[in-house]
Amino acid sequence: MRYYEEDANVTDSPNRNAAPKLIPTIKLGSQDNHDMMWNEDFHLTITNMAKKYGAIYALETGKTTLIALNDHNAVREALVNQSDVFNIRADLEILQVAPQKHFLELEAGELWSLHRKTFATAMRDYFRDRWDTMDQWLVTEIDDIEAAWKSQGDQAVFDPNRDISIKLASFLHRVMFDRRFGEFEESVFDEKSLSWLPAGFINSTRYELMPEHNKESYYAHYGDVIEKFASNLNGLDAYVSMNVLKEKECYNKGQYRHLTDFLLNACDDIPNDVKQQVGATEKEIIIGSLTQVAGAGGGVGAFALRWMLLYLASFPEKQKQVHAELDQVIGQNETPQQSHKGDLHYTQAFIAEVLRHCSITSMPASNYAASKDTFIDGYFVAKGTPLIVNNYGMTRDEALWENPDEFIPERFLEADGTFSKKQQAKSFPFGIGQRRCLGELFGKFLINTLFTHLAHRFEFSLPNNEPINLRAISGVFLVPEKVDIKAKSRSLSDS
């Protein structure tokens, strides 16, 4: 172990009167450094290193030195208390190339502020008074999922990925372009494409940070994942760009058919001199925004549902409690409504605990960097230093969670059995600070609606004698390594 030392003469530091502590550093060339840069389970490796080096440590790479934040206090200090300091994009090539450089999370400064405000306004105006319509559209897709699963019989073992992914993509296509997927879209849709993005981002970043003499061997091992990341991200960008071009042909300012129209109108309303000043174009405001709706909404929504069905199947006693509540509040042969959510306390606790326990967002897709010299918990951080924010570490923070490795939905319940908002406030599946996910409300709507309907309609189980497997494919989002389940209809008419 050695320590990261910098010139600590920082006049505006919150701890300027105290001598800076030296950051424990994982030195380039050490075995620990090799593990950090090569291990497939990056989220586990970075968390395990915190047990040895502490909640805050530095990682030397072939390109720069990064600071890893691994518990709630460290992350909150940087992203909440010093959000004005850690508000720039790290100087990494992967963050500065198209199409991802046009994504809101990967922008900084005035461009980020303008893009966020414009995107937020467009989403707010689009969803206002449309939640009931959104619910109906999503239930239409869920009905198709139900029909597909019933048709294969209750003894069929299957991965629900394609059915969930394609129907969620169809719903989002309707939100963005006012039409569901047709036969052509379904025929060319690759449900695995979004699954490559989280791991691809991590491995592409590590490849860039590798010393030159290690890059060839690293690419030989991870090159397939890196190439799929680039090709699938470009494919997603092309899909959105093609559809936006179609919609622009019949676009009339002031008329609103879908989310794309709201973004087109919002982009038109930005004065040209402001766009030029901050470097904002349609590529950011429209294409970048919609690509994130399709990618994050479709990807994370599908990842979350696969996790939740896997947890239902893996913990049958917990599933019985979910079913008992759904039957009591809704009725076994009735249809869930958005108005039921406030009475589904155990169901909400189950959802919250799955998102915590699987740690679906293991780290932000953006790499923050310090815009000036500063301190975190007494450790000096030089201007331009990139951060690794370990969200997975926060889900295993024993200062926040008792027995964090155990799956306990009841931890999100108060003593009277109601859902605990206090506990929910300690969990950050959509990020923390001013850069937390802009689509959090929409994401929660998707996850809650899909889960409530599917849990209400089916009983899920593992194949006979199949052990519980909650292993994840590591990336900025954690994707289930394997989901093989059975689905038995709970409808009384099917009994």
Curated annotation (Swiss-Prot):
The keyword Glycoprotein does not apply. Signal peptide: none annotated. One of its GO terms (molecular function) is steroid 17-alpha-monooxygenase activity. It comes from Marinomonas mediterranea (strain ATCC 700492 / JCM 21426 / NBRC 103028 / MMB-1). Cytochrome P450 protein involved in the biosynthesis of polybrominated aromatic organic compounds. In the presence of ferredoxin, ferredoxin reductase and NADH, catalyzes the coupling of bromophenols and bromopyrroles, forming various polybrominated biphenyls and hydroxylated polybrominated diphenyl ethers (OH-BDE). Can also mediate the heterocoupling of 3,5-dibromocatechol, forming six different compounds, including polybrominated dibenzo-p-dioxins, which are among the most toxic molecules known to man. Keywords: Heme, Iron, Metal-binding, Oxidoreductase. SUPFAM superfamilies: Cytochrome P450 (SSF48264). One of its GO terms (biological process) is progesterone metabolic process. Its cofactor is heme. This is Polybrominated aromatic compounds synthase. Its EC number is 1.14.19.-. It holds the Pfam family p450.
